[in-house]
């Protein structure tokens, strides 16, 4: 039998008694107890030096533990995890450092993980599905703050009084700074535009706004995907960028932020929309000023973000080349051409468009630098058709509405 059997101390004593009997081979005694000769001689030596008491296993605990985590660190770690349930070891470690603990006192990521598991504050995750293939569309990279903003609506939920709460979220792609987190009553253009006017007034203008293809940001049927809201953005010099339909992973960082919001706010809704709006603003401030991000070197977004140098009041009207005919689009989306009404799009209502004459019978319609269609003479009237693909904006030296420099 081996030392792993029950009553190991008694077995060791039995081995000592047999091995010390006259005429008994030490090797035979070791084979009888199914232990190695090295182990047998070790216990014989211990018995000779200390008697029966020496046969008890000594503590394997080190005499000193220079890397042992202090109680203060463990208490603070558990407190932070309890307050921020979905933050992992990397972010918790960064938060400990930001709270004044020295780097020598803060444990490694592996140790933090063990502490969380032993405290019942962590679950072992199973192997996830393989990631989807990333898109290959020409999405802009953000080299600095305000290069690209992402926008979306967080899926709605009901407050405890039964009212619908659907936050509009605007986020800086480079710094992860959450510029806006505000419930809207409906996805109406006027209401959303008012929010953007406030955000533009506070933070300036981005170079690009990236959205999905949903209203009021974009339209799958409108010319160049324009809506009244995105047409206004373009008049401010903001480039429009849209992810492919059905591919939210192209806006992955924004979606992950929505996931955090769902777990930490939506799961326990407030009593009213007004109370929820206050909670959302507190969450936004915490997200920007307290939550470190690995991609930012464990800095918080507020340490990286700065407002844009391109201000809302700096935007000037787009100027078309001198040989273009200019028309003001009516609210209903129509223009007048040689006394006849031609429908373009309600998205362009009250905006100015430029008509480039391609021939006596055809004019290309430009909205800023976007070719939104062509008007073709058809008998005694005019019809509109899509613009030829890959139309390049006409060269002009008089256009004061360049892409924003942020």
Which role fits each region the language model picked out?
Residues 1-14, 63-71:
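Short, Lys/Arg-enriched anionic-surface-contact patches
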Residues 7-24, 74-83:
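Short, amphipathic alpha-helical "recognition" segments used to contact nucleic acids or chromatin
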Residues 15, 29, 40-43, 51, ...:
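Mobile genetic element proteins and their domesticated derivatives, centered on retroelements
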Residues 52-150, 156, 227-230, 300-312:
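Basic, flexible linker segments flanking DNA-binding modules
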Residues 114-177, 185, 189-207, 234-235, ...:
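Mobile-element integrase/transposase regions
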Residues 200-223, 244-246, 251, 300-301:
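Acidic/histidine-rich, metal-coordinating catalytic segments
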Residues 228-313, 354, 358-359:
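Charged alpha-helix within mobile-element recombinases
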Residues 288-406:
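C-terminal, beta-rich DNA-binding module of retroviral/retroelements integrases
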